[in-house]
Amino acid sequence: MRMLLGIPYVDKSVLSNSVLERGKQDKSKLLLVDKCHYELDVEERKEDFVGGFGFGVVENSHKDVMVLPHHHYYPSYSSPSSSSLCYCSAGVSDPMFSVSSNQAYTSSHSGMFTPAGSGSAAVTVADPFFSLSSSGEMRRSMNEDAGAAFSEAQWHELERQRNIYKYMMASVPVPPELLTPFPKNHQSNTNPDVDTYRSGMFSIYADYKNLPLSMWMTVTVAVATGGSLQLGIASSASNNTADLEPWRCKRTDGKKWRCSRNVIPDQKYCERHTHKSRPRSRKHVESSHQSSHHNDIRTAKNDTSQLVRTYPQFYGQPISQIPVLSTLPSASSPYDHHRGLRWFTKEDDAIGTLNPETQEAVQLKVGSSRELKRGFDYDLNFRQKEPIVDQSFGALQGLLSLNQTPQHNQETRQFVVEGKQDEAMGSSLTLSMAGGGMEETEGTNQHQWVSHEGPSWLYSTTPGGPLAEALCLGVSNNPSSSTTTSSCSRSSS
């Protein structure tokens, strides 16, 4: 037999084997509380409160009562048998209690209970325990001679157990505040190292290393009354660390505002803030992205070559509108390219139609042009690959042609040699200035004058330029200087 709050109660094993005798009368009705100890469902609550009820409640139309014996206050009292413990009702014979005709309960042992008087509706306990009224209320005995039977802590424990029983009888979930008892007086709990003695009770406060300073564990040991053990972990009143909304995301903005979304199952944050705590990946950039980036750069360069640019020196006109560009050989004018090639293939036929004086000059021109054929082909290929160079070159040509005046224009003679009747071949042979004088070449009806606004070497498809003409063709007018001509041909070759 153990003690709870100074009141003995029977163990579970004893009560499980005990058979409760019901009264012979139909009026007696007994409600057995499960083994005198309320055990909550572990699956639903998972919390057990330490302690038990030191008294039972009997529902009966008559004023029935159950009082457990207390042998600690009366050492001469022997413990009764298990078959006669815990409960008694009207009409049940028991060695502890006797029922009088006026329904007042007296004890067979002298000195424990006194009659409540005839017609009394309550049981008056002479020993300083408590009294139960007909309404079910429990009141403390006010016997000043015997003194207080319960301490303040014991009385609060009885009140808590009575409230738990009311919730259970009403089939209502018991609040967690009642299941986990906390001391109501926190004034003496501020210092955990202080041992206090209050009403015969020792209160020991122990701190654990793995708990915060605001958490403390109370161990209350009742020594004077035979003892009750109460264990519980409580937090101080000033520290409210409990999360009132555990289903809510715990991500805050650093101040007082909190995310309103629900957390992911088994997580602390919502879907939006779950990635905040994850480490960021350091993936390398894929090669496909790099290749596409280079391709974009190349296409951008090609697009810039196709843009129409304007220059202020040409009065805001686009380059494509300048007439000098149409005379330049480029990739877009294959006729000029083939015309230059035909000039080399049919040079013999063209020279045969000229007079002897003109043939000598043309042969010198053709000799130098053969050596420059490779450079001419390279120039065409270079212009096909880089069309921007053609545009810049055309801009320079237009600038030179606009800056020149009619007095300084150079006159050139362009010979048009007709080959076969089915194919017309035009070869422009340019004769430029040599020594500041105007060269005049005698010819036949095949030559004609063509005047341009710019230098003749810019419009001619014949390679060589003004340098080849000045070195070779300029000395052809002096027939006596044969050595000079030969040296010019050797230098040009």
Swiss-Prot record:
List, alphabetically, the GO terms of the cellular component aspect: chloroplast envelope; nucleus
Question: Which key words tag this protein in UniProt?
Answer: Activator, Nucleus, Transcription, Transcription regulation
Q: Where in the cell is it found?
A: Nucleus
- Induction of expression: microRNA 396 (miR396a or miR396b) negatively regulates growth-regulating factors (GRF1-4 and GRF7-9).
Q: Where is the composition biased (Basic residues)?
A: 273-283
Name any one Pfam family assigned in the record: QLQ
Q: In which tissues is it expressed?
A: Predominantly expressed in shoot tips and flowers.
Where, by residue number, is the motif Bipartite nuclear localization signal?
A: 248-258, 276-283
Residue ranges, annotated region (Disordered): 270-302
> What are the cysteine partners in each disulfide bond?
none
Q: Which BP terms from GO are recorded?
A: DNA-templated transcription; leaf development; regulation of DNA-templated transcription
Q: Which PROSITE patterns match?
A: QLQ, WRC
Q: Where is the WRC domain?
A: 243-287
Q: Name one GO molecular function term.
A: ATP binding
Q: Where is the QLQ domain?
A: 149-184
- Give the domain of life: Eukaryota
Q: What does this protein do?
A: Transcription activator that plays a role in the regulation of cell expansion in leaf and cotyledons tissues. Component of a network formed by miR396, the GRFs and their interacting factors (GIFs) acting in the regulation of meristem function, at least partially through the control of cell proliferation.
- Anything noted about its domains? The QLQ domain and WRC domain may be involved in protein-protein interaction and DNA-binding, respectively.
Q: What is this protein called?
A: Growth-regulating factor 8
